[in-house]
């Protein structure tokens, strides 16, 4: 998995926010609330603990606030012990929660080197920001890469993402406030055929503009 490309896409609220003003044709329960997007914005630069090798927030470009706020939030999801760096243990724990099998030591090492660029054995926010900035102009997203992100959500590997699977990912990454009904609403915003699921084609149509937003 291309770690730098995937970290910033793990937030379900980022992925499943609608890009269209078209209304959803099927009716939705009146109990749906609009606070799904607001609860994803409680992270901020100032809340990132400055550990011994943590990154000064000043390294982040000031003209890309929304994107880098989301990058900081993605970093904090993985830095579970809040020491300002993503260690081998942090990364292995995240992958174990999101996948069916725990990663091998070799896989974790490859992911760390991909972002860190050396043998430090950990990833700072600066490493991640530099890596994402360096890959932002590499062109269109590869289908293989999209498939890897899709499979994080498609837990039962049936080729589509359900509201229950989306809700599970929220719990895994530490956002337990999002309800199943809110997940159903998010699914509805991108569900092309109205079957209550997001297939891979729906996912691709949603992801490409979402991942290119910060380029403009």
UniProtKB/Swiss-Prot annotation:
Q: Where does Ca(2+) 2 bind?
A: 154, 156, 158, 160, 165
The record's InterPro entries line, in alphabetical order, gives: EF-hand-dom_pair (IPR011992), EF_Hand_1_Ca_BS (IPR018247), EF_hand_dom (IPR002048), EF_hand_pair_protein_CML-like (IPR039647)
- Give one Pfam hit by family name: EF-hand_7
- Gene that this sequence comes from: CML35
Region named Disordered: 18-58
Function of this protein? Potential calcium sensor.
Positions binding Ca(2+) 3 in this chain are: 191, 193, 195, 202
- Keyword field contains Cell membrane: no
Recorded source organism is Arabidopsis thaliana
Positions that bind Ca(2+) 1:
79, 81, 83, 90
* Cellular compartments per GO CC: cytosol
Upregulation = During darkness conditions.
**Which parts of the sequence belong to the EF-hand domain?**
66-101, 103-138, 141-176, 178-213
Q: Which PANTHER family does the protein's record reference? A: EF-HAND CALCIUM-BINDING DOMAIN CONTAINING PROTEIN
User: Which keywords annotate this record?
Assistant: Calcium, Metal-binding, Repeat
Supply the name of the protein: Probable calcium-binding protein CML35
Provide any one GO MF term from the record.
Answer: calcium ion binding
Please note every region of biased composition (Low complexity): 23-44
